[in-house]
């Protein structure tokens, strides 16, 4: 059974990703927002998007524009639109299996400068989120939520690791209560999601990441912003080092 705080956490993440679009590029930005929610696992494979009326309000668009965007993503294989009482737009996208060849292709498509920029952006906003959260004096329910996200990640089956890793990292930003910071962290994660999905998962690296995740949480719960920043920096630099190794 889901807990009330789980629902609040999921709702916060949806609000972070499915934010209003600009009128001039409503269709394109709607596709971008929905694709971000899908690729980040905010709406996992097999689950359905929120109801059409709710989505249109969240995104600040007409239902006609929303339907066009959903149709485009359905045609591209990301969604399965079902009619009827139990219908809706169901996520069919499943991240591809990690592959070093795919990793090189993703990096080539991004370009060296864009890759460096994306990694720098992620480091800045995730370090900032951890620092802010460490100074916030988390209430008991929020401490429990952070610990539960860590526990879920530690117990994740390999095929669900990236999605729960994303949920853990985004939870840190969302728990700060800053919509702008949470949005920035979601954007940063989106820029490297294909990259992270393509990195082969090595058990030694996953074990090391688990230690680093624990260090991040420990520093946050101890109210140690400098320690939180150092822990996030070490963790993200480790990911960058692994990336360089597979590209060498």
Where are these regions (language model features)?
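Conserved amphipathic alpha-helical segments that form helical-bundle/coiled-coil interaction surfaces
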Residues: 118-198, 209-215, 227-237
